[in-house]
Amino acid sequence: MWIFPAMVLAGALGGWAWGMIPAMLRNWFGASEILVSLMLVYVAQKVAAWMAFGPMKNPEGFGFPGSRNLQQYPAASNPELIAGTGAHWGVVAAALAVLATWFLISRHIRGFHIRAAGLAPRAARFAGVRPETLVAFCLGLSGACAGMAGLFEVSGPAGQITDSFGSGYGFTAIIVAFLGRLHPVGILLAGLLLALTYIGGELAQLTLQLPAATVQVFQGMLLFFLLGFDLLTRFRLQRRITA
Amino acid sequence: MIDPLSVFLLLLSASTPIVFAALGELVTERAGVLNLGVEGMMIVGALAGFAAAHATGSPFIGFVVAALAGAAVSMTFAMLTQFLLANQVASGLALTLFGLGLAALFGKPLEGIKAPAMVPGPLRINWIVWLGIAMVPLIWWFLNRSRAGLILRGVGENHDAAHALGYPVRIVRITAIGFGGAMAGVGGAFLSIAIVLQWTEGMTAGAGWIALAIVVFSNWTALGVLAGAWLFGGVTVLQLRLQAAGVAVPVQFLSMAPYLATIIVLVLISAQQKYSRRSGRAAPGSLGQNFYALR
Amino acid sequence: MNRRKLMASLAVIPAIGLATPVFAQEEPLKVGFIYVGPVGDGGWTYQHDLGRQAIEEEFGDRVETTFIESVPEGADAERALSQLALAGNELIFATSFGFMDPVINVAAKFPDVKFEHATGYKRAENVATYDARFYEGRAVMGTIAGRMTESNKIGYIGSFPIPEVIQGINSSFIHARKVNPDVEMKVVWAYSWFDPAKEADAASALIAEGVDVILQHTDSTAPLAKAQEAGAIGFGQASDMSNFAPSPRVSSIIDNWAPYYIERVGQVLDGTWESKGTWAGIAGGEVEIGEITEAVPAEVKEEALALKDSIASGEYHPFTGPLNRQDGSEWLAEGQVATDEELSGMNFFVEGITAKIPE
């Protein structure tokens, strides 16, 4: 009963701890959090690979890399909630996360501080917002969210830790965040849109016999257009009047 | 026993794709632009270079075309980030996706064809390898001793100040992005024309991401890029050599080491800058930020 | 695309959401494939796709095949498999080891759909497994390698330390030793099935150790390109790689899935399909030996082909005793033959190999 919730908690905690590394290096030494976390992606991949080949290798797996499959342990698995839909606890958690993030960003004083610090760091500092606290809070929180996302995948559809676990979801998430204009509801919609291109891409391969590369090009172009035309929502075009 | 010279010669050629890509990204980042699309530009270069080399029978033309193709595809990124003010991280990731797909699509007819042979240069090492090494002092000179390099660095450190001084921030950045694309293209083409001698979908297999890490490791200096490429490549070459010599090596830990080293370098440099306020440079001041003139 | 295909594809869309295929009798049999790589990888996936094309050629209008390529192992695989099942495919081939658990899960949800999983070991009522005895081909390669090496050092580029690769290393070493008692084997692990830059480095590392014959268990042509540069020889892997013939590629080990695919589709069509594990080799045509080029002396070629024939006829098994494990303990007594269970879980090198399997 309690194993799965404990796993979710541990997943969040692990993500939080990993997210705190760039946060602390930023706060103590001023190291760029973008670059540190980019490097940590590779380190994390190697750790996962090491786990899949070493300590976590399934002893009944005939020497193949990869952990035991959690789906075979009901207490530790994250099964489909409604059969045939593919919806698991992660879907519920994601919905809750959207609500919670919306509340945090729009209704809570801490969210106001975050937005203020993002828009005008100096002004926020004068208003008594400590940037160090915010960096630690935000990176820790996003680490926890990412950790939970990974846990729901590993215990659900993926079932096991393998050397290739991850397959770029983290980078896709960055794109989703910007596509969603950094707004919780926008991110939900952008996430759905990207998921649609994945599923639609597979359907296009199936029914229209398009190669996967076409889908990739389409995704890239879709992103180009969405990112490009974001300009029009943030700025107003004005005809320059020359005297 | 393992002969250091042979390891080094191996390293020279093994690190060449990354040296090119990372030097290009270095110049781009020194202009204040973070382009995460290196992998996408490399694979486009790998395909275009291979196609041209195959069509003309001349590897040299292949490399030229690869540079042009890399630069051309980087212009989508330049367009997005410099004119449409799109986020650089997201645009770069989109460029990677686009490049991988584009190359795979257009590469279909070239599958299974062998590249034309190249004439080896001095020490039986490819001319392009020597060109890559020669680019290091050239780029160092450009960044640190030339006027154009000074402007480029100015744009990267503080684009508002550079703009106020009357420098064309946007043009400088677009040029830097294009140069980065051309170099990534040559790096990719070295893989297809000189290392694998064949076009295969997805053949860059993450080399572009390593190039990005090396730029950070280099502390944004040309010499650092070479050192980084040799360190990153060296770890791989050395662990394979040790394996071949029958020594058991903890592969995962060894391959993790350069990335940890990069983080440590980054932290040390940042700390030096933060606490001593003297010398020491970290990331260019405006790295990853978009510029728009308020007036 | 012609109009008929477009109509067919439109017809699929309403069918999505229904768990069972409709009109199974009238319509052609739909066969789906899920690939781990792109069909253009020139190796593993490419060969599976040739098998798919062979089905179309063999059965014509009676079948309709589709595929989804470049599906990452893990969470995405389950979704892609479900889509294939929902699209009305009655027989689905999953062509990578990492699809094993997703196949088992999806198969439980679609009891009417038949699944075929390559290289795995889990079966169910509607899940069969199939694999090829690549080690039989490696025995032939090992014989050529043992005869051809002048430095008495042969190298093996391993992908991952899994039973299939360990079988390959053991088999090629045993047969190289048989024809050349002085031969030594160097092993490097690339930890990848496909990474041209790394494979090139691995080949260079072997060459620098004095190796002049390279066997590869990774899919790119980079090791052959390096071998060519250094004047060494190598073998094609997965596909023929004949554009590197006659040298450095002196022969190749080809995965040919077509016979198995045609057999299984035929069984579905006539209703005799049942779940089983198939492990065929040279005899069944699954493992082919690519043309041995003129770079190999005629008598060596003859010897290699004779070995191939004796394996094909079942007269000889590549793992026949006396054979000891690496630590010197006895594995197979004189004349004893390794069982399939032993082979499919193989996690040790045979005596004489000095490299260690990474833990």
Which residues are covered by each model-predicted region?
Chain C
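N-terminal secretory signal peptides and thylakoid transit peptides that target proteins
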Residues: 1-11
